[in-house]
């Protein structure tokens, strides 16, 4: 539940109609015991703007309660969410574009994040206007040679180890669904193999069941099927993502999703997620019916 002063703004989706839509107040003991909740038609979206500094990325949280209290399984993205690898992609892609006197901006990066390598490469060369000089395939080869020395130095994102160990220790099934292919996955995780061994399974971008990359739901649906009791009811799955395409993929799979975006990402990309956090350290498991942390981190 929100504990800070909250302002709710109802946004009609789509905006064309001016008809009034009734809102009713009804008790919902399952989600908020002994507290009234606002029930609204699907055509309304409520955004809670908390009284926190404007710079905080979690100042805006989309409030939905469909999956609250019913989560049984958790799926994690990897790059930019568990591992601090997105900076490597940015560094390399900036260097490549500099040769063509072009700059790499966050609007393009936002579109590339979370996608399969070839899909991201096509976006890169097409939208940066260098496709006549550099093919998507050649871009991948060049980028690969620059990244292979950087990936083994990957650090964990804040709160990643704490959250993974907590959920695993409490018996919550966890796994990874990433657009990264197998060879890069091995390079990125080689310093953290003990932690990643806690995963029930990993679905990578080159998995034969993943026909299309994010925002298609293939990866998350494959991950759901591979749990011991799978396929899991998507309403009982919580996904953690940092990329807009990954958030949309989770929603396309019918799952709940928490977004932990880079602070430089435009906030307009964060509207689809069920909850937006500045860091994994800010996650409160009990809000989703999961066991609370036992440590004192606030």
From Swiss-Prot:
<dbReference type="GO" id="GO:0043726">
    <property type="term" value="F:5-amino-6-(5-phosphoribitylamino)uracil phosphatase activity"/>
</dbReference>
<feature type="active site" description="Proton donor">
    <location>
        <position position="79"/>
    </location>
</feature>
<dbReference type="GO" id="GO:0046872">
    <property type="term" value="F:metal ion binding"/>
</dbReference>
<dbReference type="InterPro" id="IPR036412">
    <property type="entry name" value="HAD-like_sf"/>
</dbReference>
<feature type="binding site">
    <location>
        <position position="77"/>
    </location>
    <ligand>
        <name>Mg(2+)</name>
    </ligand>
</feature>
<dbReference type="InterPro" id="IPR006439">
    <property type="entry name" value="HAD-SF_hydro_IA"/>
</dbReference>
<comment type="similarity">
    <text>Belongs to the HAD-like hydrolase superfamily. DOG/GPP family.</text>
</comment>
<feature type="binding site">
    <location>
        <position position="242"/>
    </location>
    <ligand>
        <name>Mg(2+)</name>
    </ligand>
</feature>
<dbReference type="InterPro" id="IPR023214">
    <property type="entry name" value="HAD_sf"/>
</dbReference>
<dbReference type="InterPro" id="IPR023198">
    <property type="entry name" value="PGP-like_dom2"/>
</dbReference>
<keyword id="KW-0460">Magnesium</keyword>
<dbReference type="Pfam" id="PF00702">
    <property type="entry name" value="Hydrolase"/>
</dbReference>
<dbReference type="GO" id="GO:0016311">
    <property type="term" value="P:dephosphorylation"/>
</dbReference>
<keyword id="KW-0809">Transit peptide</keyword>
<feature type="transit peptide" description="Mitochondrion">
    <location>
        <begin position="1"/>
        <end position="46"/>
    </location>
</feature>
<keyword id="KW-0479">Metal-binding</keyword>
<dbReference type="InterPro" id="IPR045228">
    <property type="entry name" value="Gpp1/Gpp2-like"/>
</dbReference>
<keyword id="KW-0686">Riboflavin biosynthesis</keyword>
<feature type="binding site">
    <location>
        <position position="79"/>
    </location>
    <ligand>
        <name>Mg(2+)</name>
    </ligand>
</feature>
<keyword id="KW-0496">Mitochondrion</keyword>
<protein>
    <recommendedName>
        <fullName>(DL)-glycerol-3-phosphatase 1, mitochondrial</fullName>
        <ecNumber>3.1.3.21</ecNumber>
        <ecNumber>3.1.3.104</ecNumber>
    </recommendedName>
</protein>
<dbReference type="GO" id="GO:0000121">
    <property type="term" value="F:glycerol-1-phosphatase activity"/>
</dbReference>
<keyword id="KW-0378">Hydrolase</keyword>
<feature type="active site" description="Nucleophile">
    <location>
        <position position="77"/>
    </location>
</feature>
<comment type="function">
    <text>Acts as a glycerol-3-phosphatase with higher stereospecificity for L-glycerol-3-phosphate than DL-glycerol-3-phosphate. Can also dephosphorylate in vitro 5-amino-6-(5-phospho-D-ribitylamino)uracil, also known as ARPP.</text>
</comment>
<dbReference type="GO" id="GO:0005739">
    <property type="term" value="C:mitochondrion"/>
</dbReference>
<dbReference type="GO" id="GO:0009231">
    <property type="term" value="P:riboflavin biosynthetic process"/>
</dbReference>
<dbReference type="GO" id="GO:0006114">
    <property type="term" value="P:glycerol biosynthetic process"/>
</dbReference>
<dbReference type="GO" id="GO:0043136">
    <property type="term" value="F:glycerol-3-phosphatase activity"/>
</dbReference>
